[in-house]
Structure formats: C-alpha cells, structure tokens
Amino acid sequence: ELPKLNVNDTVRVRIIAVGVKHILVELYGKEVIIKAEDLQHTYIVNCKDYYVVGEYLKVRIKQIDITNNIFHLSAKDFTINPFQYIRKYIEVGGEYTGKVIAFPKQNSGIIVQLDNPGITCLIRVPAKFNSYPHYLDKVLIRITEIKEQKKLIYGYLMRVI
C-alpha cells in the first residue's frame, strides 16, 4: 500500500500514541510522527487535550519518500481555519479576555488563548506591571495588530482579572 501513495493523497490513520507536542500515528503499518503545528491552525498547548489513542484521523500527505523513510502528514486541511474570518470576531484596538497558556522562549511576552474564538495571541507585558501573570490566569488584553496570512495576533496586557 505504501508505494501507491502520492503527495496530496488523503488517508485515514490511527493514533497509537499521544505526546505533548506531537502524536504518533500508524500509516499502513509505518509509524509516523505528526507535530502539533500540523494538526490544527491554532496553538496547541498539549495534544493530550485534543487526541486520544485509538482514534482515527483524516490527514493529507505533504511529503513522502519511502526509501529514505520521510513522511510528512498534515491534518490542517480538514479543520476550519479560524484566521480566515478573524476580523468578524476581533478588531484592532478591541479589548478581550483570555487565559495565559504559554510563555514562549524566543519571544518576550505571553501567549493568551482568547475566550470567544479560541485563538491565541502573543501579548506583551508592560514594564509597569509589578506581578507577572501566571499559567492559566485570566487576563484582559488589547489587540494591536492582526496578521491573517501569517496567523499571528499581537497585543498587550491591560490587567490580570
């Protein structure tokens, strides 16, 4: 079955293990890792919150090289892209509530998941804040920039609720 597969083919795979930032699936007897960024359009903190061992998942083959054992699968094509209609829910200058879900290493700030559309934003914490927000704290933020093509939303922290 593997030699018959081509790029852009749609296949159904079974989840055999779930990690924090990836899942392990079985593709016609071959074990393949799918990273969290290839599963959904939004930021995934923990894959265990979304996927369960034994579930089946519809994926598209992005890259396949059987001789070198290279497989790149993506489930993004079969999920709704919330950034496509993001300006219906969010506007620049608007204030929104969300919860702190991560602290990125390469960028300064925090990652906040908004309550309403369920998307994530990179938020700056102003220097005037004495107490830095903690994991899962509820916060009020103001949006400063929306980049639909890059799937990025920026803002700054107003206050911890």
Regions found by a protein language model. Name each.
Residues 1-161:
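Single-stranded RNA-binding regions, centering on S1/OB-family and related RNA-binding modules
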